[in-house]
Amino acid sequence: MEIANLKVYNDNMRKSLLDKAYFLSFVDSDTFIDFGCADGSLLKHIHEMFPDKKLIGHDISPEMLQVAEKNLEGCNVSLYNNFENVISLKLDNATLILSSVIHEVYSYGDNQSVNEFWRQVFNENFRYIAIRDLTPRKSIDRMSDINDVSRVLHNANPTHLAEFEA
């Protein structure tokens, strides 16, 4: 996946930061692993709340990891481009965070990469797996109306549409 504007993408992802961190008070982990950490904003937030926890970020984008490295300066965070390296750490009490990555895998990956993603997720190393709940409202019981979609396409910021596919 190529992101045209990292700043716009990361700014939009940060808007839901508190939702993504909601689970923190419900798990007792020594380590938090953000799979698809982007610019590291969630890891930075966790570090501010729990400075003694071990934090690990993973992203397949070298550009994102460079931004995360700058954003996380002074935080005790390890960043990885290859998730197999994270798995090899053999962490006993770790929470794997999947806050904004599942839709990316399905949107941009093929069947093989989707299967590989789930193989990595369900590795025995993780005590908890935190998935941000993005269930639709109960009132949604139909396909999107083409007029609604057209209205969104007409009124939306073109940069946002480029970053978040309709």
Label the predicted regions.
Residues 41-76, 81-85:
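Class I SAM-dependent methyltransferase SAM/SAH-binding core
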Residues 97-98:
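A conserved beta-strand element that flanks and buttresses the S-adenosyl-L-methionine
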Residues 86-91:
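Short conserved loop adjoining the S-adenosyl-L-methionine
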Residues 105-121:
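A short, conserved alpha-helix within the catalytic core of class I
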Residues 35:
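Conserved beta-strand/loop positions that form the S-adenosyl-L-methionine
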Residues 128-165:
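Conserved class I S-adenosyl-L-methionine
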Residues 10-29:
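Conserved alpha-helix/loop element of class I SAM-dependent methyltransferases that forms part
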Residues 38:
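Conserved glycine-rich SAM-binding loop
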